[in-house]
Amino acid sequence: MNEKILKTLEYDKIQQALLGQVVTANGRQLVQAMQPLTDPVAVQQALDETADGASALRLKGGIPVPQLENIDPALKRVDIGAVLNGQELASISRVLQTVSAIDKFLTDLQDQIDFRQLYTLQESLTVLPQLSRRLKTAVDPDGTLTDEASPQLHGVREQIKSIEGKIRGKMTNYTRGAQSKYLSDPIVTIRDDRYVIPVKAEYRAKFGGVVHDQSATGQTLFIEPQVIVALNNRLREAQLAEVAEINRILAELSNELAPYTGQIKANAAVLGHFDFINAKARLAKAEKATEPLVSADNDVLLRDARHPLIDPHKVVGNDIPLGDKYQAMVITGPNTGGKTITLKTLGLLQLMGQSGLFIPADDESRIGIFDEVFADIGDEQSIEQNLSTFSAHMDNIVHILKQLSQNSLVLFDELGAGTDPQEGAALAIAILDAVGEVGAYVVATTHYPELKLYGYNTAKTINASMEFDSKTLQPTYRLLVGVPGRSNAFDISARLGLPSVIVERAKSMISSDSHELNNMISDLEKQRKAAETAYEAARRQLADAQSVHDELAAAYKKFTTERDAQLQQAKDKANSLVDKAQTKADKIIKQLRQMQLTNPGTVKENQLIAAKTALKQLHQDEPLQKNRILRREREKQALHVGDEVKVASYDQTGTLLEQFDKKHWQVQLGILKMKVPTDEMEKIKPSKQSAAQRPVVKVSGGGMSGPSTTLDLRGERYDQAMADLDQYIDAALLAGYPSVTIIHGLGTGAIRNGVTQYLKRNRQVKTYGFAPQNAGGSGATIVNFK
């Protein structure tokens, strides 16, 4: 992108605003190097990064990038074998700690936020945990080495503290004792790295020791008392040892960094990129900017676009279309009406979008991808235009025409101004034709009425104007697309008090064509305002309808949620009641069995089985409940005496003998006659003869559809095996089997013993015993029924 357009449209001020948002040296470099991009993929990637930054800012307060200095010079010094100082090491330590923090930050968010680019950028980071911990442990943020940097450093510092404590103790005798009256001030100070006291010159003889300094007047001598000379010597030795150990540690840490300088430098660059993304997101928030769509066809539509450098409380937003049906737009209207600002808004927002920045416009705005943006915009708000001004503009236009391509955007402000109106209008039309022949996109502002007709008659060209309020005599700064500007000179003059005679005389001097053109424009403005009013009314009605729809949707969702909750609550309550009934029923069955054992013959076994099976059906079968259509269809089937039916509760096929009532039938199941609920039966074959014509035939269990004659309990838990055994024996009895085989395996013997105990208690079992060796041996039990 040419440098002139960046200067003309004040692109540098956008960069300055971004610089106020970055906190790292590498981030500042990226902002300063920022340029509009011309590759659609690169533009979309840059916008994706800004969108990620905006999401992170909104949800997490931004990517955690702290202030970071430029560490490149320090890394270069390491590469040549130099020893870094504490501040340089602290700066590198902050970079390494930030790498770890951001890596963890993004890893923790991977299941929460679907970033478009940040996770890819995260992969460019190289986490160096051991080196980071080493630097963090050894170096404070201000560059001071910590006591944990080495045991030797910790030891020598403890020694220094001990000696200093002894020195202060002895010095206290001078500052607080009887000799304090000989001091200029009762304090301890340092001269030449040694502790001294300020002694009045006339009392020098009262103190032994060494004089290290004197005051400017000579009235105070700074004396090191003899009693602490040895301590000061020891202190000095310890301090020199500390310095030596610090230098050794700095060299050691610098050597440890040497193998990783390339990775650390790359990390710093990636952190700068994260900082740059943060800055773009913060600027977007400050400007209330949105992400623009990218049109590969250069179909530009800026919705309520605002110039980012104008006070947001004063700026007027405009819809600016270009490139769909029209490649050229001619904007007419009065001076100070906002034409130039409209041009600059279009150009600057286009540059911002191509730089990966959000733009101050409404959602769903679109930008194009132009390889160049050219502009001829000068300070032509003054009417004093001369030949030199015209020449300067024409020189710029010639330069633009030489570089045009079909992917260029050209902005002309007051095209053809500064010369004779007729010649200027002709030149303006010819220049617009030349731009159109290349296929470039152009927006031009002008005063010339001839260009209004040009915009009306030329293909892919549309007129536009800046609205002017004739009542207030003030521009509204609103762009009216499709409506050419009209002169308001007569209206303004009349409202300002110019005699009507003069106004009418002036009107008579212009051609009838001009009158008709102005009248046509006036009618267009009225129609536009009427359409705009109707549109606003429709928009409000649509918004109201949407609001009602949203409320109804929310209410319906709440209703269904509460309904489902109540249904589930009722089902749970019903199942709870059934559980209680089941418990009571089991107790009753147990009592019945005891009665049967005590008084044989009083209770029939099939009654016990029927009662127990019916109780098992008390719980709601949720899949069956949900399949209500099938259940209703089954209930609609007419049943007749003699029909063959499948009884779901027994998993047996039987024959209908007699209907007790609407809900119950007597069914022949093998050797047993059972009372069965209607809704547990499914007709499998219609009757072919009436009950009177069709005799009831007893069918042995062996010929009926029923359970297998073998039950395999191997691999089951004890409780489950016993439950399966109980259910199987009931089914076998109903099927009329004379004998069955129970396979329990050997294992620990628990299930085998359980089977034996169960069969021993069951009064329907005649005999039982292990199978022959060739049929399973002690791993299976053969049961014979009565």
Curated annotation (Swiss-Prot):
Keyword DNA-binding: yes
Major enzyme class: hydrolase
Molecular function, one GO term: ATP-dependent DNA damage sensor activity
NCBIfam families, sorted: mutS2 (TIGR01069)
Family label: Belongs to the DNA mismatch repair MutS family. MutS2 subfamily.
Species whose genome carries this gene: Lacticaseibacillus casei (strain BL23) (Lactobacillus casei)
Name of the molecule in the record: Endonuclease MutS2
Alphabetized PANTHER family for the sequence: OS10G0509000 PROTEIN, OS10G0509000 PROTEIN-RELATED
Residues the entry annotates as binding ATP: 333-340
Taxonomic classification: Bacteria, Bacillati, Bacillota, Bacilli, Lactobacillales
Smr domain residues: 711-786
A Gene Ontology BP annotation from the UniProt entry: rescue of stalled ribosome
